[in-house]
C-alpha cells in the first residue's frame, strides 16, 4: 500500500456539480492533487486507502465507456466499494422517477454518487435529495466538470501553464457539455478561448461566456496553442445542423493542412468518442501532436483527486 498523498487540499464544496462556482485556487488544488495520482498510477502498487469503508455508486442514465470505467478504476484504487448502476438495470425503466431513485439510493447510505444524466440540471436536482457527495459525470449539454479538469491537467503537463494560452475549441459547441465546462475553467485560469464552428452549431450569445468566435478553421486556429476537437452530437440534434458528414469534414474536420494554421507545437485534443473522418482525420488523431491517449490517462488521476478531495469533507473523514 502506498503512502497518503502529500497534498492536503480539501474541496470547499460538498458536491462537484460543475466548473461554475469553482475558484482558480480550487482548480489548481485539484490539478496539484491529480499530479500525485498520475505518478501513483504508473507504479506497480496503485492502491491507497483514502476511501476504505466508503461506498461509491456510479449511476449512469446515458451510455459511457471512458467516464464510467475511469470513475470505477479511480474509486477502487482509493479503496472504495464501487457499485455500477445503469438505467437498463434500474427501476426507472419501470416508471420510477429520478427523485424516487435518489431517495431509494439515499436510504442505502452511499457516501459518493457519480451521476450522468441526459437532462441538463438533473444531477443538481438529485444532489438535493441525498446526504452523500454527488459528482456530475455529465448532464445533458450543461456541464462535464471532470472532463474539463483532465483536459486542463493534460495541457498544464505539456505546456507548463494554462494562463495566456490560446485554446481553440472546434466543432459542435452548441450541444457540448465539454465545451461549456472547458470554457468556464479556461477563462477562470486566464487562458484565451476561441470557439470555431459553423453558425448552426454555435449557441446564441456564446460571446457572453467570454470567448472569441470564428466561423472558419483558418481564422480559428491561427496562433492556437491547443486545438480541441468536438464530435457532432447527433443524439442531441432534433434537425439537420450540417449538410453532410463529408461536407462538414471538408470545412471543419481537422486534417494536417488545417492543423498547420495553428502553432507548430500546438496540441491536438479530443474528449472522445472520436468520429474519424468527420471531425478529425486519423493521421492527426494518431500523430505526434496528439495528446488524446494522454487525456484518457489523466482522467483516472483527476477522478481519484476529485473523489479524495470530496471524501475529506465526509463525516469521520
From Swiss-Prot:
Pfam families: OTCace, OTCace_N. Its EC number is 2.1.3.2. Gene3D superfamilies: Aspartate/ornithine carbamoyltransferase (3.40.50.1370). The keyword rRNA-binding does not apply. Carbamoyl phosphate binds at residues 66-67, 116, 144, 147, 272-273. InterPro entries: Asp/Orn_carbamoyltranf_P-bd, Asp/Orn_carbamoylTrfase, Asp/Orn_carbamoylTrfase_sf, Asp_carbamoyltransf, Asp_carbamoyltransf_Asp/Orn-bd. It catalyses: carbamoyl phosphate + L-aspartate = N-carbamoyl-L-aspartate + phosphate + H(+). It comes from the Bacteria. GO terms for molecular function: amino acid binding; aspartate carbamoyltransferase activity. L-aspartate binds at residues 94, 177, 231. Pathway: Pyrimidine metabolism; UMP biosynthesis via de novo pathway; (S)-dihydroorotate from bicarbonate: step 2/3. The keyword Transferase applies. Catalyzes the condensation of carbamoyl phosphate and aspartate to form carbamoyl aspartate and inorganic phosphate, the committed step in the de novo pyrimidine nucleotide biosynthesis pathway. Belongs to the aspartate/ornithine carbamoyltransferase superfamily. ATCase family. Heterododecamer (2C3:3R2) of six catalytic PyrB chains organized as two trimers (C3), and six regulatory PyrI chains organized as three dimers (R2). This is Aspartate carbamoyltransferase catalytic subunit. It comes from Rhodopseudomonas palustris (strain TIE-1).
Amino acid at each position: 500500500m502506498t503512502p497518503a498523498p502529500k497534498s492536503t487540499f480539501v474541496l470547499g464544496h460538498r458536491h462537484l456539480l460543475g466548473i461554475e462556482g469553482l475558484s482558480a485556487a480550487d482548480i489548481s488544488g485539484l490539478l496539484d492533487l491529480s499530479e500525485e495520482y498520475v505518478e501513483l498510477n504508473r507504479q506497480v502498487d496503485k492502491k491507497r486507502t483514502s476511501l476504505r469503508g466508503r461506498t461509491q455508486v456510479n449511476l449512469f442514465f446515458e451510455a459511457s465507456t471512458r467516464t464510467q470505467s475511469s470513475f470505477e478504476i479511480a474509486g477502487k484504487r482509493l479503496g472504495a466499494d464501487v457499485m455500477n448502476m445503469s438505467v437498463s438495470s434500474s427501476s426507472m425503466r419501470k416508471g420510477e422517477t429520478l427523485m424516487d431513485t435518489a431517495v431509494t439510493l439515499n436510504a442505502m447510505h452511499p457516501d459518493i454518487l457519480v451521476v450522468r444524466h441526459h437532462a441538463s440540471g438533473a444531477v443538481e436536482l438529485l444532489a438535493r435529495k441525498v446526504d452523500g457527495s454527488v459528482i456530475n459525470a455529465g448532464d445533458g449539454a450543461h456541464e462535464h466538470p471532470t472532463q474539463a479538469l483532465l483536459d486542463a491537467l493534460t495541457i498544464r503537463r505539456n505546456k507548463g501553464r494554462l494562463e495566456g494560452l490560446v485554446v481553440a475549441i472546434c466543432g459542435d459547441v452548441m450541444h457540448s457539455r465539454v465545451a461549456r465546462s472547458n470554457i468556464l475553467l479556461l477563462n477562470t485560469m486566464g487562458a484565451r478561448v476561441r470557439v470555431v464552428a459553423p453558425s448552426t452549431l454555435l449557441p446564441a450569445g456564446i460571446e457572453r461566456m467570454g470567448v472569441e468566435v470564428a466561423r472558419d478553421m483558418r481564422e480559428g486556429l491561427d496562433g492556437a496553442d491547443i486545438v480541441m476537437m468536438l464530435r457532432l452530437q447527433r443524439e442531441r440534434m432534433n434537425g439537420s445542423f450540417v449538410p453532410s458528414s463529408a461536407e462538414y469534414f471538408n470545412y471543419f474536420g481537422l486534417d494536417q493542412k488545417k492543423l498547420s494554421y495553428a502553432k507548430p507545437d500546438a496540441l491536438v485534443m479530443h474528449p472522445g468518442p472520436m468520429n474519424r473522418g468527420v471531425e478529425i482525420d486519423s493521421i492527426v488523431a494518431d500523430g505526434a501532436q496528439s495528446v488524446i491517449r494522454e487525456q484518457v490517462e489523466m482522467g483516472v488521476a483527476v477522478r481519484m483527486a476529485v473523489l479524495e478531495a470530496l471524501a475529506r469533507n465526509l463525516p469521520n473523514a
